[in-house]
Structures are given as C-alpha cells and as structure tokens.
Design a protein with these regions (language model features):
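An alpha-helical, amphipathic repeat domain used for nucleic-acid recognition
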Residues: 1-185
Length: 185
C-alpha cells in the first residue's frame, strides 16, 4: 500500500472526453448530473473544463445517448418490476441521481398509475421472504422494511391488520412510528 497521494490523470481534450463519456454510458445508463460529475475529474478546473463538459453533454443529447426522461422511465420500471419498490423510494433515488422534480413527478404518476400500492408492498415482502410476524419486535421489523421500500404508513398498517395482529401490537407500532416521525421532522 502506497502512502503517496494518487496522481491526478492528465486532463482530456474534448474528443477524448467524448470517448470517455460514451464508454461510461456503454457500461450503464446515467443521468446528465451523474455524467457531468464523472467527467469533472477528467478535465481542467474552471471554465475551460466546464465548457468541454457542456459541449460533450450537448453532443450526447443530440445523438440521444444521454436522455434523463428515458433514464427516469427505465429506472422506474426496473425498480418497480424487479425490486418491488414503492413510489416514495423510487422518487428519492431519482432525485439523488439528479433527475428534475417535474420529470420525476410525471414519470412516477405514469408508472404507478395502475399499480396497487398494497399489492406491490405484499410482493416486496414476498421478495424479501418475510413471514407473518408473531410478536411486536418482528412487526416493527416489517414496518421498517416497508418504510425503506417506499410505502406509506396507511398501506403498511393495512397489511399488518390483515394479518390479524393483536391490537396492542398495532397500537405500540403506531406510537413508535409517531415518535420516529416527530424526531425526524
């Protein structure tokens, strides 16, 4: 293990930066923000480097190699079908990746238009191989799992009630969730 700091690579000219960006997009889809962040390490600091990045991004958009709306649609479909994530989780992930708020809203409204959130939450539990909880501790684990999965508390408690859990357990979980929400707000 070397203690010397890593040597910064030589800044790329515009044509090499374009090839670098195409290679990065060839490995996986990226948003404009992600690609700009990736290219920033390969150019000079300041306006000169930013001008190269902007030129490459514009060229990639014109060639339709880089398209945030196509990315958002594909990402949402994959998260919904494969991971069985709820709308909130996908919204947070798209936002973290730099997709615009309006685009996220329209994409999610279209993708989750004919999807039952309760059915999706049950599929998420099946995917995670979660069994019906037998005590309060396991019930709290299920609640946390579904909240992380992007499902609303209304749907979560509807599922818990359908499992005929004792009223004391549901009441305890509701107070725990209310306390957690008060702390995080």
């Amino acid at each position: 293990m070397s203690l010397r700091p890593k040597k910064k690579p030589e800044p790329l000219d515009e044509s090499l930066l374009y090839e670098y960006a195409v290679g990065a997009l060839g490995r996986r889809m990226r948003t404009v923000v992600e690609l700009k962040r990736l290219m920033r390490t390969r150019v000079e600091e300041g306006d000169v480097g930013q001008a190269k990045i902007d030129a490459v991004v514009q060229r990639l958009k014109e060639q339709r190699y880089l398209d945030d709306s196509a990315y958002a649609v594909t990402f949402t479909r994959l998260r919904q079908e494969n991971d069985k994530f709820g709308k909130r989780r996908v919204q947070q992930e798209l936002s973290r990746k730099g997709v615009g708020t309006d685009l996220i809203s329209t994409t999610l409204d279209t993708a989750y238009e004919n999807v039952s959130e309760e059915e999706l939450a049950r599929k998420h539990l099946d995917r995670k191989r979660v069994k019906q909880p037998v005590n309060e501790k396991e019930s709290a684990r299920v609640v946390r799992l579904l909240v992380r999965g992007g499902f609303s508390l209304g749907v979560i408690f509807k599922i818990l009630k359908s499992w005929n859990l004792p009223d004391e357990t549901l009441a305890a979980l509701e107070t725990i969730e209310l306390n957690d929400n008060a702390v995080s707000d």
